[in-house]
Amino acid sequence: MSGLFAKLDPRRVQWGANWFAFRSRVLRTKPVESMLETSGGTGAHGTKLARVLSTVDLVSLGVGSCVGTGMYVVSGLVAKEMAGPGVIVSFIIAAVASILSGVCYAEFGVRVPKTTGSAYTYSYVTVGEFVAFFIGWNLILEYLIGTAAGASALSSMFDSLANHSISGFMINHIGTLNGLGKGEQSYPDILALVIGILVTVIVALGVKNSVGFNNVLNVINLVVWVFIMIAGLFFVSGSNWDEGRFLPYGWSGVMQGAATCFYAFIGFDIIATTGEEAKSPNTSIPYAITASLVTCLTAYVSVSVILTLMVPYTEIDSDAPLMEMFSLHGFQTAKYIVAIGSIAGLTVSLLGSLFPMPRVIYAMAGDGLLFRFLAHVSTYTETPAVACVVSGFLSALLALLVSLRDLIEMMSIGTLLAYTLVSVCVLLLRYQPEGDIHGFVNFLSEQNSKRKEGVLAECEKEACSPVSEGDDYGGVPTNTCGAKNLPSLGDNEMLIGKPDKSTYTASHPNYGTVDMSSGIESDETDSAYLLKLKKLLGPRYYTMRIRLGLPGKMDRPTVATGRIVTRCVVLLFILIFCFCSLIIFGSGQIADGQWWAVLLLVVLLLVLTLLVFIIIQQPENPKRLPYMAPCVPFVPASAMLVNVYLMLKLSTITWIRFGVWCFVGVLIYFGYGMWNSTLEITAREEEAHASTYQRYDMGVDDNFAVDDDLYPSGDQGPFQNWGKGGQQKQPQQEQSEPQSDGLDRLDNHRTSSSSSHSRAKSKASKPSPGFEALVVDDDLDDPLE
């Protein structure tokens, strides 16, 4: 019926083709074989990045990117204005929320370790091109603003040590920038510009140099932290935590403080951007993420305890809390010692923002989504020097013209969105079948397959047919369409480096996994949490699983179950957004007991619970990674809930600015990135290659078609002149064989020959000179034999 309508309305054919092409472009995923390394050669974008980062270096980068602003700025701000001494609880809650996203990041870091670009690359190989560009574009925003804010914070620190003489000089001799900042004290911060340029030069000189500089500053910061702990013990007073003073703003203040403290943990995603420069990314990345978050939590809680015990929360200086707390007790020397640590910590935070930014730009430009000159890697420093210089200059320019207060308001929304997407991807990939784990967007395949017509569809159908590779793979059937849908057999070796254990599969399309046939059974791979639950419940555990309809050990995901999970996750995200909006903007109505608000809250909770339960009932993919996020789907769903809640807590002006930035990114993608993407260029080359053989057929009268009307019984048929070198070969038939059987054998033989020719053409380095040459060179046996 649809074919009839298509014939009656040609516009429908054109619209359908255009819509299919558009949807294919925005949903196409990056094949993992494109990231294959060549030993001793160059990478995908030219010169390879140097592998010089150890696990200690990664932990140092993660800690440094977080601990500076969190310890020296956020602790005092939250303690004074939001939670009082309850800032300790706020930091713990924020740490739990950060760990939820951190474990999801760690699993993705193991699944796709040898990449740059963090959530951008993770999204590209799993979700699709447009979503990946959107996430990468907003990661650039986060790092851009974070770098500018770090430079401005350092400038303010130096200005404070100089008794504000620097800002006074700028205002008196240069003037203010009322149009770009808030208040009369917004001035062109030349010192911040200089700081931004200097740090850009340090990062551009090379990874090893910048990481070494980062480690030195972290050591200084560690020494100052130890000094604060020891010196502060001599001035603590338990009266500051007397009854009523620990939670002066109540639990609402603690939760508000937790939302702010969460920003102190933003930055561990820098570890995920260094996969192409880490020595052992499959083990270093998850360990470094976890160790960084735990280290930051320890530093924040300990500093908050000393701060709130030394100074009543009402007397805390929100701009420089740790420096001024010793001044209140007359210990001026300690103030300058803490100032040294503040400068070191803020500098490391500045490096933590600037270090990953050029690597995200490098990854996007190398894929063609941004201008390709940004993907140039310096042969001297082995760093993306062009991207580093361009991004560093833009950050320094922002620090010069925009005030610190305005920069902070835009700092976190892009990061929270990236964290949310990573959690979504982890949840989706766990429940996809083995064939679709590389691209779960194949739930649209049923509709898409009906749209494909013509030579390209036949080529794709034939290219994706299972074939035997002979001696190379021992005759094992393999899928040959890896460049479009599935990773190749060697992807696992590429993505996880040299296997540390023999359990890594080297012949399975699920890259980054452990081969279950190597002796690791399902019971042995159960998590510690599941084993404890089994011991606790005993035989009732299996009875409960049966009654709840949970999948068995031998159940495997299918396309249908994967599609169910995909739809449930989409609905889960939408309903989480509605639920958080109701909690934030309808809290007053809920507290007043208005029936519609309470009813809506209950309905949302029930539907969210139902969706999670439906996901639990679907079988998981049995393949194991060296590290996997625990308690799926609860951990990713909880991370989504927390991140969406914090995003909605941001101000309206932040959302407006975020919308403008996204609009510019959409223009760049649809105007440049979509048409210059590496995947787009590859698709064009494949289409041109296929159309070459189509043109050979168009101008040739097909004398070889077999038709009952043209090939009556007893005739020699049109094959009498088909032979090699002009030799004639007469088609022979056995007299006892019916004519219909001969025709069936002929059709089968022609189909097999066509498949052989197509595979031969796809491997040829040059196109065939013509259809006639193919006929002359053909050495086929008699088609009816």
Swiss-Prot record:
Biased segments, Low complexity type: 727-740
Biased composition (Acidic residues): 775-785
Mutant phenotype after disruption: Morpholino knockdown of the protein causes smaller eyes compared to wild-type animals and aberrant light-induced locomotor response.
Transmembrane segments: 58-78, 83-103, 119-141, 187-207, 216-236, 251-271, 291-311, 337-357, 360-380, 384-404, 407-427, 568-588, 596-616, 628-648, 655-675
Example of a GO cellular component annotation carried by this entry: lysosomal membrane
Record family assignment: Belongs to the amino acid-polyamine-organocation (APC) superfamily.
Localization per Swiss-Prot or TrEMBL: Lysosome membrane
Source organism superkingdom: Eukaryota
Record-level Gene Ontology MF annotations: amino acid transmembrane transporter activity
Keywords, sorted A to Z: Lysosome, Membrane, Transmembrane, Transmembrane helix
Protein name as annotated: Probable cationic amino acid transporter
